[in-house]
Amino acid sequence: MTRQSYVLGNWKMHKTIQEAKEYVQTLASLLQGEPLSCTIGIASPFTSLRAIHEMINTTGAFLWLGAQNVHPELSGAFTGEISLPMLKEVGVEFVLVGHSERRHIFGESDAFIASKVKSVAQAGLVPVLCVGESLEVREEGKAHQVIKKQLLLGLEQMDNGSEFLIAYEPVWAIGTGKVAEASDVQDIHMFCREVVAERFSEATAEEISILYGGSVKVDNAQRFGQCSDVDGLLVGGASLEGQSFFEVAKNFNV
């Protein structure tokens, strides 16, 4: 079946509000000149979300606006955190959950990630659940085992029929310049579908879009576009410049 393709840019801790505005203007112009069939999304820092939302409305560009993180509670004494009502108010439509940097730098557990996935879905936004193995785990031959655990625990509180995306991001390939072989990525994506089928249904497994993330650049994006179970990309550094992000996205213009 034909699944919707997504190419999502994760800016991480980059770009001021003014830089974000200039970026969206550039990307909007590129998309107007050459519309793409894939859904292009940007997960910016919290400070730029409102400005980007306004730019999307002004330019008429079809861009999916996302956040890089959220707290599962709707309000409370959580210093430094952002809630779902706050994100919805500034036009956010999807949220990255379980990114490896949140897991490993900030110590987020599978249980906490599961609560975020559930809260994002209940708020009417789309959670993008990120999963992936470390180099040590891969070398030990335990990648499937770890990813299955992350998926089952991360989706534990989700109902069948709830909308979500999965992003496979091998930890050893994020920001390192190391790129996974297309055959390895295809294998993991097929395995992710098997786990989703086990957790929900075969129909859900066939419908769900699974993205790849890990040192994706213009010169290697094509290899993933040719994989039957890769439905898009989660792009880090290559998403920070509008032209390069656009060139990456063209590999999923089907």
From Swiss-Prot:
Pfam families, alphabetized: TIM
Record-level GO BP terms: gluconeogenesis; glyceraldehyde-3-phosphate biosynthetic process; glycerol catabolic process; glycolytic process
Pathway(s) of this molecule: Carbohydrate biosynthesis; gluconeogenesis; Carbohydrate degradation; glycolysis; D-glyceraldehyde 3-phosphate from glycerone phosphate: step 1/1
Active site residues according to the UniProt entry: H99 (electrophile), E169 (proton acceptor)
Residue ranges of coiled coil: none
A single GO molecular function term of this UniProt record: triose-phosphate isomerase activity
Listed PROSITE patterns: TIM_1 (PS00171), TIM_2 (PS51440)
EC number of the protein: 5.3.1.1
Binding site for substrate: N10, W11, K12, G175, S215, G236, G237
CDD domains, alphabetized: TIM
Main location: cytoplasm
Catalysis: reaction(s): D-glyceraldehyde 3-phosphate = dihydroxyacetone phosphate
UniProt subcellular location: Cytoplasm
UniProt entry keywords in alphabetical sequence: Cytoplasm, Gluconeogenesis, Glycolysis, Isomerase
GO CC entries: cytosol
Subunit structure of this chain's protein: Homodimer.
Stated family: Belongs to the triosephosphate isomerase family.
HAMAP family: TIM_B
Function of the molecule: Involved in the gluconeogenesis. Catalyzes stereospecifically the conversion of dihydroxyacetone phosphate (DHAP) to D-glyceraldehyde-3-phosphate (G3P).
Protein name as catalogued: Triosephosphate isomerase
